[in-house]
């Protein structure tokens, strides 16, 4: 259980509650969650964050009416800067997007600008939005996370509660290595509803070699952990940085979609460019 799971700031969220689905535009449906809720317990302050990054969202269920009333469909790509005061709560994002369904817009650019404006206001930070017609994305191959997969280890695990101590003494030798490690076994749970969140994670670092068994045990320990996607990625970054002390570190997770949305947060303290292609489970 997260230390802030019952925080007052979460009580007003529509997440986990019965809600009406509106099909006419309503920006008030968007709800933000303060990033400070998970950053404060990690000792992270807004003016001294050890990383940069973004939350990348893919919007698969986006539709509205053009000026003549003809339905339009698009795939949206949203990037929410890590410095924003709030992250966007995903159910509220879904409800907000539903409110476009029977709303007329003069152009695709009007839709894009509306999304960008409203998301910036909710997040209290920088947001960029791009919209794609379906034929622009057709035929794109399924992507994969570059790196060495650490999942096929012959180890026995019987503890699934979060424990950062798996990373204690997880480095060895004095030689500096550069590695990119990947796991598809990341599973955590929604902070509010405790529904499962499934993801793949890429960890790229430069530093003393990290023991892959200990790293995998650490990642599997998220299996009963309740936090939002973005919060899990920042926790993983912070734990590896603190306990393994790499010179450079990037953590990137791509989660399976829910409600027509997938969330793909990344955090890095070096020059890192995330690949944004859809993975096989997305």
Swiss-Prot record:
Catalytic site: 190, 197
Subcellular location: Cytoplasm
Tagged with keyword Oxidoreductase: yes
Enzyme class of the recorded protein, top EC level: oxidoreductase
Record's catalysed reaction(s): 7-aminomethyl-7-carbaguanine + 2 NADP(+) = 7-cyano-7-deazaguanine + 2 NADPH + 3 H(+)
Pfam families: QueF, QueF_N
Record carries keyword Chaperone: no
Gene3D superfamilies linked to this entry: 3.30.1130.10
Annotated binding of substrate, by residue: 88-90, 229-230
Residue positions binding NADPH: 90-91, 258-259
Key words, A-Z: Cytoplasm, NADP, Oxidoreductase, Queuosine biosynthesis
Chief site of localization: cytoplasm
Subunit structure: Homodimer.
Name of the featured protein: NADPH-dependent 7-cyano-7-deazaguanine reductase
Gene name per UniProt: queF
């Amino acid at each position: 259980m997260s230390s802030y799971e019952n925080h007052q700031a979460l009580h007003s969220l529509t997440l986990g509650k019965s809600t009406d689905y509106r099909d006419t535009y309503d920006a008030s449906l968007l709800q933000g969650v303060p990033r400070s809720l998970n950053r404060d317990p990690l000792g992270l302050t807004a003016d001294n964050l050890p990383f940069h990054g973004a939350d990348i969202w893919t919007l698969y269920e986006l539709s509205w009416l053009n000026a003549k009333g003809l339905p339009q469909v698009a795939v949206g790509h949203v990037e929410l800067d890590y410095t924003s005061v709030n992250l966007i709560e995903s159910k509220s994002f879904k409800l907000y997007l539903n409110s476009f369904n029977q709303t007329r817009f003069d152009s695709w650019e009007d839709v894009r600008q509306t999304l960008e404006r409203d998301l910036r206001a909710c997040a209290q930070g920088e947001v960029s939005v791009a919209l794609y017609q379906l034929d622009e994305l057709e035929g794109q191959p399924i992507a994969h996370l570059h790196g060495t997969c650490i999942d096929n280890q012959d180890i026995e695990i019987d503890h699934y509660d979060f424990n950062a101590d798996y990373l204690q003494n997880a480095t060895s030798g004095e030689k500096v290595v550069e590695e990119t490690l990947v796991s598809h076994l990341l599973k955590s749970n929604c902070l509010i509803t405790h529904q499962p969140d499934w993801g793949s994670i890429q960890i790229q670092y430069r530093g003393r070699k990290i023991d892959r068994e200990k790293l995998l045990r650490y990642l599997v320990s998220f299996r009963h952990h309740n936090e939002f996607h973005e919060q899990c990625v920042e926790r993983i970054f912070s734990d590896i940085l603190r306990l393994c002390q790499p010179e450079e570190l990037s953590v990137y997770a791509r989660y399976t979609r829910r409600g027509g949305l997938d969330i793909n947060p990344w955090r890095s303290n070096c020059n890192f460019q995330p690949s944004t292609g859809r993975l096989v489970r997305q």
